[in-house]
């Protein structure tokens, strides 16, 4: 008779191998196929159902980069990851800076996630701050940096980023808040959307706080300093994958 621990270990290995294979297939498939949903969307939907909130629905509408305004692409880079074109998924200078700042200040720790890390985390992983999830996030980040172009990473990020309660992706956010497609977003509208990205449940696009409005103006200045639309073209971020 098989030892129950051996039986459990056998199935745990089976599950782990299956998950790894699924991740590999997903990385390859999503390098060219539209992403239908992210793990964050699934997690939010299940959480709503468990809370008996059946009115909640995760909305997302995939669009290719050719249907996304350069303004929003530049805005999220200016707001979230200005070294995005140069790094291989990790901004070690930002990580070091955040570690020093967190050591000197009490309270909630701040992160230093790049756009690549946020894409890997939101697309493939559950929410949380465990070392296991961080390790998996690092591996998935390296995988998409290796297998996808920077343009593709940015396109996927813009399609799965959360901009409000049940609002995922720039197309859905643009329609919901501004009643237009993502291709028609102005610089000011794009900066406002990017301003809530750190915490779209705390910061609101439709009722922005003074902090959000200040952040919007800061993002607009950073967009100009980066060079506007020419920055995207110069760094090969305008290719429609």
UniProtKB/Swiss-Prot annotation:
One of its GO terms (molecular function) is peptidoglycan glycosyltransferase activity. This is Biosynthetic peptidoglycan transglycosylase. Belongs to the glycosyltransferase 51 family. The keyword Membrane applies. NCBIfam families: mono_pep_trsgly. Disulfide bonds: none annotated. Keywords: Cell inner membrane, Cell membrane, Cell shape, Cell wall biogenesis/degradation, Glycosyltransferase, Membrane, Peptidoglycan synthesis, Transferase, Transmembrane, Transmembrane helix. SUPFAM superfamilies: Lysozyme-like. One of its GO terms (biological process) is peptidoglycan biosynthetic process. GO terms for cellular component: peptidoglycan-based cell wall; plasma membrane. Peptidoglycan polymerase that catalyzes glycan chain elongation from lipid-linked precursors. It is found in: Cell inner membrane. It comes from Photorhabdus laumondii subsp. laumondii (strain DSM 15139 / CIP 105565 / TT01). It is a single-pass membrane protein. Pfam families: Transgly. It catalyses: [GlcNAc-(1->4)-Mur2Ac(oyl-L-Ala-gamma-D-Glu-L-Lys-D-Ala-D-Ala)](n)-di-trans,octa-cis-undecaprenyl diphosphate + beta-D-GlcNAc-(1->4)-Mur2Ac(oyl-L-Ala-gamma-D-Glu-L-Lys-D-Ala-D-Ala)-di-trans,octa-cis-undecaprenyl diphosphate = [GlcNAc-(1->4)-Mur2Ac(oyl-L-Ala-gamma-D-Glu-L-Lys-D-Ala-D-Ala)](n+1)-di-trans,octa-cis-undecaprenyl diphosphate + di-trans,octa-cis-undecaprenyl diphosphate + H(+). The keyword Signal does not apply. HAMAP family: PGT_MtgA (MF_00766). Pathway: Cell wall biogenesis; peptidoglycan biosynthesis. The chain crosses the membrane at residues 15-35. Its EC number is 2.4.99.28. It comes from the Bacteria. Its main location: membrane. InterPro entries: Glyco_trans_51, Lysozyme-like_dom_sf, PBP_transglycosylase, Pep_trsgly.
């Amino acid at each position: 008779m098989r030892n129950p621990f051996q039986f459990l270990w056998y199935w745990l290995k089976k599950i782990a191998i299956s998950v790894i294979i699924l991740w590999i297939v997903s990385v390859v498939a999503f390098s060219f196929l539209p992403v239908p949903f992210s793990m964050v969307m699934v997690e939010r939907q299940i959480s709503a159902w468990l809370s008996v909130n059946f009115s909640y629905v995760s909305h997302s509408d995939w669009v290719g980069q050719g249907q996304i305004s350069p303004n929003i692409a530049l805005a999220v880079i200016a707001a979230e990851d200005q070294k995005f074109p140069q790094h291989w998924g990790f901004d070690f200078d930002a990580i070091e800076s955040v570690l020093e700042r967190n050591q000197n200040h009490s309270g909630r720790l701040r992160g230093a996630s790049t756009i690549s890390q946020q894409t890997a985390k939101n697309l493939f992983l559950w929410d949380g701050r465990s070392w296991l999830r961080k390790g998996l996030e690092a591996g998935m980040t390296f995988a998409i940096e290796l297998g996808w172009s920077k343009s593709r990473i940015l396109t996927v990020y813009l399609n799965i980023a959360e901009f409000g309660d049940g609002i995922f992706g720039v197309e859905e956010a643009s329609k919901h808040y501004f009643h237009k497609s993502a291709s028609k977003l102005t610089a000011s509208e794009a900066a406002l959307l990017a301003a809530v990205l750190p915490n779209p449940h705390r910061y609101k696009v439709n009722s922005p706080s003074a902090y959000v409005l200040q952040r919007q103006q800061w993002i607009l200045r950073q967009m100009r300093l980066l060079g506007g639309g020419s920055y995207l073209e110069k760094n090969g971020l305008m290719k429609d994958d």
